[in-house]
Amino acid sequence: MLNKFLISLGIWVLRLISLLPMPLTRALGTGMGLIAYALMSKRRHIGMVNLNLCFPEKSLAEKQRILRQHFAELFIIGLDYGLLFGASKFRMRRLIKYRGFANFEKYYKQRPIVLLAPHFIGLDIGGNRTTMDISGYTMFSEQRNQYLSERVKQARTRFMIHNGGEIFSRQDGLRTIVKKMKQNKLP
C-alpha cells in the first residue's frame, strides 16, 4: 500500500514538473544530476570503468566531463518522464519533432516494418510520440513492482490505443510482435 502511494506521489510530482518551461526542467535535472554524480560513488565508479573500457585514449578530465554530462542527462530525462504520464497530444507534438519521417512513411505504407531502437535515454518518450501518428506494436520491460509496471504500461499506451497499437512485454520476445503483425496485417 505504501509502495502504491509513493509511486503515485512520484508520478504526480513528475507530472507537475512536466508543466514547467523546458529550460527550467533542464536546469533542475542538470542540478540533480550533478548532485547525484557527487554522491553516488558506486554508480560513478561503474560509469568510469565503462568509459575506460570504451575510450582508453580519452583523458581522465574528458571522461569525467562525459560522465557528469551523462548524470545530468539521466536526471533531465527522468524529470521529462512526467510528459509520458500527462502531457497533451498538442504539447507532445510541439516538443518532439521527427527528422526523416518521410523516409519511414514511404516504406511503412508498402509493407510491415520492424523498427529496432537501442534503449538509450528518452526512448519511451519518442516512442510515445510516434504512436500518435502510426499504428504498431511496441515492447516494454516489466518492472519489479507490478503497480509501477502497470502505470508505465498505461502511460506508454495512452495514445496508441486510439490507432490499433498494442504493447507487449519484452519477456515475450520479438517473435510475438512479428506474429501479431502477420495476423493483423498491420504494418
Feature annotation, model-predicted:
Residues M1-V114, I121-G122:
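Membrane-proximal helical "anchor" segments flanking the first transmembrane region
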Residues F85-P187:
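Soluble catalytic domains of membrane acyltransferases
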